[in-house]
Amino acid sequence: MSGAVALVLAGGSGTRMGRPKQFIELLGRPALYHTLRAFQEAREVERIYAVGEEERIRDLASGCGIDKLCGCARPGESRALSARNGLLLCGEEDGVICLIHDGSRCLVTPQLIGRVVRAVEEGADGAIPAVPVPDTIKVADGERVLKTLDRSSLRAAQTPQAFRLGLLRRVFSAPEEVLREATDDASLVERAGGEVRLVPGERTNIKLTSPEDLVLAEAILAARERRGSRL
């Protein structure tokens, strides 16, 4: 075991869904259960911390055998501010690898978790899963197309994103206005001049953002259950 820690961000209000998406049931269990279960099963992860409703998350974990959960933090006003709150729980050892993950990415697998941890162990400042962008991407001004981007160099970033704790503490000490604008953790490391390595992501590792995503996620979970595998 490498002794990595996982920080799961589960404090979203679910504005677009009309309810907190991390607690929407998929196959009879909250989406967050499926997220936590992947980190519970990942041999590289020693401890799990979460950002969100502490009582609700602890009840979920204790009722489902998630015994790696070690603490919960209150959400912040933005994703990065929530992550900063959670990092306060993760310990003072600079060399420990920390994986920051969107709680609504409930289809993450232990195999993907292992890949990002290994990339940091091999020397990268950070590692993020990413997949090629299959669609043609247009830059638009309202309804007017300004230009077409070369998709061969484009990648869609996913989570979990892995970094050493010491580096995370440094980059999350940036001013709050910088943190509010950050849409992922790697962008803060990039801003500080760090090397972020891409590892193969998984197209099934979707983020729940629309009702259609719920249908797709439940179908993928059901297929995995039939196979007896998280792959």
From Swiss-Prot:
Pathway assignment reads:
Isoprenoid biosynthesis; isopentenyl diphosphate biosynthesis via DXP pathway; isopentenyl diphosphate from 1-deoxy-D-xylulose 5-phosphate: step 2/6
What this protein catalyses is: 2-C-methyl-D-erythritol 4-phosphate + CTP + H(+) = 4-CDP-2-C-methyl-D-erythritol + diphosphate
Question: Could you say which enzyme class this protein belongs to?
Answer: transferase
Annotated site (Transition state stabilizer): R16, K21
Supply the Pfam families for this chain: IspD
Superkingdom assignment: Bacteria
SUPFAM superfamilies on file: Nucleotide-diphospho-sugar transferases
The protein's UniProt keywords, in alphabetical order, are: Isoprene biosynthesis, Nucleotidyltransferase, Transferase
Q: Which GO terms describe its molecular function?
A: 2-C-methyl-D-erythritol 4-phosphate cytidylyltransferase activity
Single Gene Ontology BP term? isopentenyl diphosphate biosynthetic process, methylerythritol 4-phosphate pathway
Please name the CDD domains in this protein's record: CDP-ME_synthetase
Q: Look up keyword Cell membrane and say if it applies.
A: no
Any idea of its EC number?
A: 2.7.7.60
Keyword field contains Ion transport: no
Instruction: Name the site position(s) for Positions MEP for the nucleophilic attack.
Output: R151, K207
Q: Which family does it belong to?
A: Belongs to the IspD/TarI cytidylyltransferase family. IspD subfamily.
> What biological function has been recorded for the protein in this entry?
Catalyzes the formation of 4-diphosphocytidyl-2-C-methyl-D-erythritol from CTP and 2-C-methyl-D-erythritol 4-phosphate (MEP).
- Return the protein name: 2-C-methyl-D-erythritol 4-phosphate cytidylyltransferase
The source organism is Rubrobacter xylanophilus (strain DSM 9941 / JCM 11954 / NBRC 16129 / PRD-1)
Taxonomic lineage: Bacteria, Bacillati, Actinomycetota, Rubrobacteria, Rubrobacterales
